[in-house]
């Protein structure tokens, strides 16, 4: 069994996203098995077909400035979230900032580990102080998260949950492949990192389709060092005729759940027949 892969506190990488039907999951798994191994979380989720739960609580300003920047296609923007894995009942939890760098596909990711006794007091207690036991990089990332949280007056907005099968390359310095399925969301105004009720399944024709109905309901993401896309990744894209597509779980969930059922930003043939109330 592989050891847990620990992401560095700051990671700058190139991210490629594709929408695929669930039927592609196993063939793609077979293809990349020559170059990749399951990550620790997937390897320990054999009973669930190597899919594990990812729970993310997304934050935004009171007037949704992060979302507005995303919709406007602003080149330099940030996304802030707290994340936990599995059932979310125990730490570690993670604070994450994803910063778009002005270059298509290039993302800088800041991450800090949060202990049980720190959550959610680090965001709700004005007297909270970062522990001296944190490493210098962890401390710097927590301080950055808190500065942005205070200056933007961030609030919990959306909780998402999905099942992920993840891989890491065994032949490259850094390549990570993830496939996210069974995605759910709910509006959230507190700091709970998981929910057992009120989660809405992503509706296929509303969420995933582009201008028409689609069988795509899984998000495939390939992450690698900038300027180092391996040949096997290009072969994967060509073999399965994958088309790169932007997809934001936060933006999609928020638009559909908060803004007129998403009608104002979707073309008429993408409107859902289902209720998102």
Predicted region positions:
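Phosphate-end processing signature that detects enzymes handling 5′-triphosphorylated RNA
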Residues: 1-277
């Amino acid at each position: 069994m592989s050891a847990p892969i620990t992401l560095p506190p700051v990671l700058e990488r190139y991210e490629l996203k594709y929408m695929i039907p669930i039927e592609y999951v196993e063939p793609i798994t077979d293809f990349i098995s020559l170059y990749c191994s399951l990550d620790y979380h997937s390897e320990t989720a054999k009973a669930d077909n190597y899919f594990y739960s990812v729970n993310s609580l997304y934050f935004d300003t009171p007037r949704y400035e992060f979302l507005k920047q995303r919709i406007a296609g602003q080149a330099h923007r940030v996304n802030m979230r707290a994340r936990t894995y599995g059932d979310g009942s125990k730490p570690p939890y993670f604070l994450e900032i994803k910063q778009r760098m002005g270059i298509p596909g290039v993302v800088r990711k800041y991450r800090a580990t949060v202990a049980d006794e720190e959550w959610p007091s680090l965001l709700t207690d004005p007297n909270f102080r970062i522990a001296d036991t944190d490493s210098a990089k962890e401390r710097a990332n927590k301080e950055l998260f808190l500065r942005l949280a205070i200056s933007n007056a961030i609030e919990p907005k959306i909780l998402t949950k999905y099942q992920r099968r993840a891989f890491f390359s065994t032949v490259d310095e850094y390549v990570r492949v993830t496939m996210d399925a069974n995605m759910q969301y709910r509006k959230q105004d507190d700091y709970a990192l998981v929910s057992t009720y009120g989660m809405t399944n992503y509706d296929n024709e509303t969420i995933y389709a582009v201008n028409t109905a689609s069988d795509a309901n899984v998000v495939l993401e390939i992450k690698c060092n900038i300027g180092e896309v391996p040949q096997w990744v290009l072969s994967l894209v060509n073999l399965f005729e994958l088309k790169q597509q932007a997809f934001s779980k936060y933006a999609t969930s928020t638009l559909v759940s908060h803004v007129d059922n998403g009608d104002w930003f979707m073309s008429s043939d993408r409107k859902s027949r289902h209720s998102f109330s």
